[in-house]
Each structure stands twice: as structure tokens, then as C-alpha cells.
Amino acid sequence: MLRHVLFVAVAMFTSVASAQSTARTQYTDPYGYFTTDAQYEAWYSLRARLATGFDDVCGDTFCEGDFSNIASLRFECSVQRGSGRIGSCVWSFAASSEEIVPTTGRIEVLQPTWQCPIPVAPHTTIDALLAALAGEDPLHAPLPGTTLSVYDGLTHCL
């Protein structure tokens, strides 16, 4: 009986400690963190300018190889609910390459995807990221707390 009570007490303590730890480090997408229209607008603008910047450089860089049609899917960051600190950011891409089989007329398609981690410095907040990348060329702007850019993250991925 005593052993059962002790087990239940330890299990309850572990559950409470785990719940508290999870509550402290709960992450969401930026939409779950933002509280002002200005934050939403800055995020939408950043994502659009990153996609445009990628399209502008793709033909001379990433899209010269086997896949000339690499397309930006989504730039996303995880944000700690309480502090606004970024957990990580990733930019997803997809492409295709089609080849016709001459003897059958069948089309073979390769459809690679990439999930490119962005080199965000520890303890960077989403608001600091938005401010640092607010200019005309967020693809090449230095990320907060580092000399690296979003573009640098892509060169190690695509």
C-alpha cells in the first residue's frame, strides 16, 4: 500500500513538473504570438519580400542545376508564447524535373523538397527578426546577433 501511494505521488509530481516545463516552453507559429496589426503586416510583408527576393536570384543561383523551377513554399518560424523568442525558422521549397520515356511516352517525375534551416541566433525574438529584415532585401540582410543572412541558410541547403 505504501509503495502504491509513493508511486502515485511520484507520478503526480512528475506530471506537474512536466506540465510546468511544457507551459514555460510552449511554441506556436507567429500568428499565435502576435497581438498587433503591425506585427501581422510585418510578417506578411517579410514573407512576400523573401519570396520575391528568392525568385530574383533563383535563376542565377539555385535554379541552374537539375531543377530550374524551385519554388518557395513557406517561410515559417516557431515562437515561444511567453517571451517571443524564436525556437527555429525554416524555409520550405519544392521543385520538379520531368523526363519523357521515348519508348512508352510515359513521363517520369522527380519531385524533391527541401526544408532549409535559417541560421537564427539563440534568444532572437520574432520582433527583432521582423525589425532586422524590414528593409528592401531581407534575403541578404544580416540576421539579429549574427553576420549570417537568410540567403546563407539557403546556400547550405538548396
Would you name each region that the model predicts?
Residues 101-124:
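A short, surface-exposed beta-strand/turn
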Residues 14-18:
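N-terminal signal peptide c-region/cleavage motif recognized by signal peptidases
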Residues 81, 93-97, 118-122:
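A mature extracytoplasmic/lumenal domain signature
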Residues 4-13:
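Sec-dependent N-terminal signal peptides
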Residues 20-88:
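N-terminal secretory signal peptides
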Residues 86-89, 109-111:
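Short, surface-exposed coil-to-beta transition loops
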